[in-house]
Amino acid sequence: MARNACSVLILNLIIIYFKLNKKKIVFFYHPRKLLTFMHQFYIEDLLEDMSENYSVIYGHEVNINIGKKYFYIKQGYLKFILNIDLFISNNICDVFPPGSKKIYIHHNVYDDPWVPRNKEKVMCQRFLNYNFIYLSSKMQIKMVNEMFRRYDIGKFPNLKEIGYLRIDYLLRKYSEKLKIKKDSIVIATTQFEGFPEFTISNHLKDIIFELLNESSYNVILRPHPSNRAHIKIHELIEIFKHNTRFQCDFSENYVDSYAKSQILITDMSGTAYTFAFLTLCPVIFFLPNDDAIKKNNYDKLNFFLNRTKIGSTVRDVKLMSQEINKVLLKIKEYKESIQRLSKDIKYYGKAKKKFKEELDLIN
């Protein structure tokens, strides 16, 4: 409590100083400890060279010192921070500085579901506290628009198309690294508990065995950040710890693992299209319960409709190696298809510029 109170006092004094210097205050808040560092690097790049009319402050709940402009403050104390002009987050918050304009930046590139259907209405109601939702493309805007209207919510935040900030940053910063030799296959999962009908978690051991025994590729397991401490992950590490071709990647930035991977295997993680656009390499979706797509009314989403444009779908672990070989024969074809698909994102490569333009329009 004392630490939060101290942060409130210091922040309000800093804001007074900035206001005396005619600065507009941007406050970016990281509400989830486990996801803070995976977003930190590209968010800093986005905000640090804002025009001289803005001053940027960051808030977080991680129990370590992150940096000069970062302040530890529990979400409940945000209501005591005064005179913030623009409050921004890329995970949902429920408490805000009073009087601020509130912006949510969605952190996936495609129109994959954000939460299961049974949690969607509550999520939509939480979003009503925001003034704006920034999205990567018109397809995302269409999905979010339909999501609010599904629950008869007529008045919802202003939906803005800005492109995808993270991919733009990674392509700009790591263009040479992304050209390195591909000697791996990466398995990237969605949150185990998030979509239980689709999760790959119960098949991971068999998939890893299959890849190690039937291919010459190294195998990288990259769990969702919220599952890093999950018992299933640590059981897998224990099982495969003596195999030099296996590694588990807990890093905050996936670029190293993605750069050296020829194929990504996933269930329904939004990272599927991120990987494809970033590397121009194919994706294999492992979905043994494919019927759940139609049951949940996901069959009209581009995320599922366009799977064949970036890769293929497997429903049985025993068919994984066979499918990998088929996909490898069409690497050039997938590369061209992925490049065409990326052009559907209007501000691809221009997200940072578009973000700043939208910010400048807010009074």
What residues fall within each predicted segment?
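Membrane-proximal basic amphipathic "stem/tether" segments
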Residues: 1-33, 38
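Catalytic donor nucleotide-activated moiety binding site of glycosyltransferases and closely related
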Residues: 55-70, 212-249
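Catalytic binding pocket for nucleotide-activated donors in carbohydrate/polymer assembly enzymes
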Residues: 155-156, 270-343
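Donor nucleotide-activated moiety binding/catalytic core segment of transferases
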Residues: 73-82, 227-273
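A donor-sugar binding/catalytic signature common to diverse glycosyltransferases
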Residues: 92-106, 113, 250-296
